[in-house]
């Protein structure tokens, strides 16, 4: 999983795969799922992210995961 945060537009993206999404499904206001043509979930986009979740907590998880992977 790859985590991207754009603080200029306050958007968080969780990349769940390398496949190119073919469509988007809005599941709630400002929360979108990127899906392939066969329905596989490949990404989650959260707009106005800092109002919906603790961004620093999410970004720190990414750092911890990367450090554990480097230790292997």
Task: Outline where the language-model segments fall.
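Short loop/turn motifs at secondary-structure junctions and domain boundaries
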Residues: 23-27
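Short loop/turn microsegments at loop-to-beta-strand junctions
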Residues: 29-31
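C-terminal structural segments of small proteins and small subunits
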Residues: 44-72
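Short, acidic, Ser/Thr-enriched surface-loop or helix-capping motifs
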Residues: 7, 35-36
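Short linear motifs in exposed loops
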Residues: 15-16, 45
């Amino acid at each position: 999983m790859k985590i991207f945060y754009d603080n200029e537009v306050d958007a968080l993206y969780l990349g769940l795969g390398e496949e190119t999404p073919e469509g988007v499904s809005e599941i709630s206001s400002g929360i979108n799922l990127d899906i392939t043509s066969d329905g596989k979930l490949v990404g989650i986009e959260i707009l106005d992210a800092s109002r919906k979740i603790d961004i620093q907590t999410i970004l720190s998880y990414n750092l911890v995961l990367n450090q554990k992977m480097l230790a292997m």
